[in-house]
A protein has these predicted regions:
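Helicase motor core with emphasis on the C-terminal RecA-like subdomain
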Residues: 1-220
Length: 220
């Protein structure tokens, strides 16, 4: 009761992720919380945060049922970004259906690009679509680095995905935070919630499914 009586702010981070059935449930929870707070005499201010929502005011309004003022002027310092599209090359001598040429898999190319960036001194985060792909890309990048004579770099490449034990996940996050890891192949588990600083490059092996996810991953 004391908390509700003195409630001043409710902060909802990454509000663009609350959509569909999940978003409807969050919306109901927020509205119920506001009604209970009002019953205790509190009128908390709602703060919604998102770096990728196409219509931030509309999204926030749908979640809370109130009129929302959008603050869209970005004053955060950001460096210049370059977005490049990479098409995998053809596998020499390989033929597909009806003799069609076959391209290298996206994961193979992603690992090659990742290792090249690491050799150039760029801390790199590589997003893939599955847990298995995260393990595969990290392993292939390590192999490329060893072949290039940088086994020391290979030891500083890892994969990150859901399903790890909590202590293993925290250990990887600490290595990311302190700069010990130079390269990480990950699923969308690193797309949200964890601050990854000091990155130089992001590789996406395929379109992540939504424009919001693309912006979120590219902005890491």
């Amino acid at each position: 009761a004391r908390l509700l009586r003195h409630l001043r702010y409710i902060v909802v981070d990454e509000c663009h992720t609350y959509r569909g059935v999940f978003g409807a449930n969050v919306s109901l929870v927020l509205r119920r919380l506001l009604r209970i707070a009002k019953a205790y005499g509190a009128e908390p201010t709602l703060i919604f945060a998102s770096a990728t929502a196409a219509d931030p005011a509309g999204q926030a309004s749908r979640l809370c049922g109130r009129e929302v003022v959008a603050v869209t002027e970005d004053a955060a310092p950001t460096g210049e970004r370059t977005i490049a599209l990479w098409e995998p090359g053809f596998i020499e001598g390989a033929e597909g259906e009806n003799g069609a040429p076959v391209r290298y898999p996206a994961t193979t190319e992603a690992a090659s690009i990742m290792s090249t960036l690491l050799l150039e001194g760029a801390r790199t985060l590589t997003f893939v679509r599955s847990r298995r792909a995260a393990e595969t890309v990290a392993m292939r990048a390590q192999e490329d680095l060893v072949v290039a004579g940088r086994a020391d770099f290979a030891d500083r490449v890892a994969s990150y995905r859901a399903g790890y034990l909590a202590e293993d996940r925290r250990a990887l996050e600490r290595r990311l935070d302190d700069g010990d890891l130079l390269g990480v192949a990950t699923t969308n588990a690193l797309e949200l919630g964890i601050d990854v600083g000091g990155l130089d490059a992001v590789v996406m092996a395929g379109f992540p499914g939504t424009v919001a996810s693309f912006r979120q991953q590219a902005g890491r």
